[in-house]
Each structure stands twice: as structure tokens, then as C-alpha cells.
Amino acid sequence: AVRETAHAAAPLLRPDTLLVTAAKGIERDTHLRMSQILEQETGGAFPIAALSGPSHAEEVGRGLPTGCVAASVSQAAALTVQDAFMNDRFRVYTSPDIVGVELSGALKNVVALACGICDGMGYQDNTKALLMTRAMVELCHLGERLGGDRQTFGGLAGMGDLIVTCTSMHSRNRRAGILLGQGKSVGQTLAETGGVVEGYYAAASMHQLAEKTGVEMPICRCVYEILYRQRPVQEVAR
């Protein structure tokens, strides 16, 4: 939808437009990040920023304190986004690492599926802490190989977003993982979760990127095998 929307909007943009993406994902066939899609569809004529972080809309809408990162290769663009969105309830930090911010926002959904599977199988806090920490190491390795900064993955847009997505019942990806852990099939899980389970699609992209770059990602590979190779959850857990 991002590509189609950007394509339709491109002829309407004024020369002084700043493009901001709040969508978290990787395009399935091309493995492009959202800002790269915007750049393609608008001819690279506009500055682009990504706004990302642990920001479930349910809580933002209620005015609960929230923090995000505005990332752009253009410091002026990042500062403009910060100024536009920040208030006493919504803190915005800036970063030049749009690659790391976008990758961490997209790939953490795969880890949320894994944590949900743990919940569904009855595992508790120790197991999830182990899973989240080691999975973040995997994301760091892939992110660095793709041009991101390791420090970004340990910050608000990385570890912060990972924590909220892996622990909140607002998270569709975690809810989907719980159903898988309880023994539901992939088809049943996607139907019952409601809405788009981003981690389902991100798992395929992550698997392909890991193979292409030669990065070992055993935890994320297990999620991929459950989703796309029908590997039993109980077998993977062993």
C-alpha cells in the first residue's frame, strides 16, 4: 500500500514537501525499506524521514507518555519532524541512521511472534528474556550488514520497540504467536488474529536477507520454518 499511495501522491507534492513514513515494514519482493520506496516513487526529489519507536496507537491516542525517533540522512528533516510532533506527552529524538531505525522497526515483529509462541506454550519470563536478548543480537548482525548502526538497535527504535511489541497485548504479532504456541495452524492464526500480522511477511524477507548476506539467525530461522515450512512448534522448541 505504501508504494501505491506514494505513486498516486507524487504528482500532487509541492517542491518544499518533506515526506515522513510511520509505516514499519519491508517490501516483500524487493526487500526495500519504506523510505526507499518513497524515494523511488517520488524520484528522489524530496527529503525523507522515518518516525518509529514503541508507540502503540491505543496509548498515543489516550495521551500516555510515549517516545519515538525521527530518522533521516538530512539533519534538517529530522529536526523538522521532531518539532512538528513533539509535545509534553510525545517525546521525539533524532537520528541520522534511517537504515537502522527502519530495519529494527520492521524486523522486531518476527521476534514478537517468537515471544508469543513462548507465551502460548506456557513458557515464562526467563525464557522470553533469553529469547528477546539473543534475537536482538541477530537483528544487530543483520542490520549492520545492511548498513545500519549497531547502537540504533540498542535504543528506542530498536530495543524499545522490541520490548513493547513482544510484551503488549496490543501487539497483533504477539497475539498471533500465542495462537501458534497453542497449536493453531498458520492459516487459523492469521484468520483469528485480525488485521495484518506484519511478522508473517517480515519473516520471509528476513530469511532471504540473512541468506543473501550470510548472517546466522537461528531464532528467526525457527520462526520462518514454523510459518513457511510447517515445522511443528513443539519440535522447534526442543
Question: Where are the regions that the model predicts?
Answer:
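Internal alpha-helical scaffold of NAD(P)-dependent oxidoreductase catalytic cores
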Residues: 5, 12, 37-47, 65-152
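General beta-strand structural signal in soluble alpha/beta enzymes
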Residues: 21, 46-52, 92-96, 154-155, ...
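Generic structural signal for well-ordered, non-membrane alpha-helical segments
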Residues: 2, 27, 31, 35, ...
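NAD(P)-dependent Rossmann-like dehydrogenase/reductase catalytic/cofactor-binding core
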Residues: 108, 115-119, 123, 144-154, ...
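Rossmann-like NAD(P)(H) cofactor-binding subdomain of soluble oxidoreductases
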Residues: 1-65, 81
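Glycine-rich beta-alpha junction loops
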Residues: 24-26, 52-56, 74, 96-100, ...
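Active-site-adjacent beta-strand anchor residues
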Residues: 50, 71, 226
